């Protein structure tokens, strides 16, 4: 089980090789971002695409960014699609990546079902909840 960062100049190829499934994750963002917009952000190097591989097969895709905040540096998983791949099996590799990038935290954006799973299996804890109301 390894995480392979995809260079920004290889995003188009990765998209054709299956990373386009990240559009599914974008659909749960409440209109914040589309799959095409995510591809553009990745191509510009603003976030990093990770290929999740096991036994020489791609089993999932994730997108991360480093957030340098005033009191901490965090690796934030913004998008993830790994159908039945067990993302938690890749978590040690993700923590190692975060440490090598100088991060002291790993954060993720997710829905309630994933939040429960990540709390139980990976030790995540809620930091805050973001709510919104649409204006006319």
What are these model-predicted stretches?
Residues 1-33:
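Short amphipathic alpha-helix that is part of the acyltransferase structural core
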Residues 28-47:
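Active-site rim helix/loop that mediates acceptor-substrate recognition in acyltransferases
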Residues 42, 54, 96-98:
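Structural motif
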Residues 44-85:
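Conserved donor-binding loop and adjoining core beta-sheet/short helix segment
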Residues 46-47, 119-126:
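Short glycine-aromatic motifs
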Residues 50-52, 106, 131:
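Hydrophobic beta-strand residues in large extracellular and virion-surface proteins
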Residues 72-122:
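Acyl-donor binding region in acyl/amide transferases
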Residues 125-136:
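Conserved catalytic-core motifs of GNAT/GCN5-like acyltransferases
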């Amino acid at each position: 089980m390894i995480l392979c960062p995809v260079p920004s100049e290889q995003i188009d190829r990765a998209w054709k090789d299956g990373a386009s499934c990240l559009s599914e994750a974008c659909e749960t963002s409440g209109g914040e971002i589309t799959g095409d917009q995510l591809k553009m952000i990745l191509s510009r190097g603003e976030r990093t695409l990770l290929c999740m591989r096991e036994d020489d097969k791609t089993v999932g895709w994730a997108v991360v960014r480093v957030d340098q905040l005033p009191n901490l540096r965090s690796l934030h998983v913004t998008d993830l699609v790994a159908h039945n791949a067990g993302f938690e099996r890749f978590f040690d590799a993700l923590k190692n990546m975060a440490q090598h990038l100088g991060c002291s935290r790993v954060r993720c954006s997710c829905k309630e079902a994933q939040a429960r799973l990540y709390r139980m299996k990976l030790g995540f804890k809620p930091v805050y909840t973001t709510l919104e109301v649409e204006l006319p």
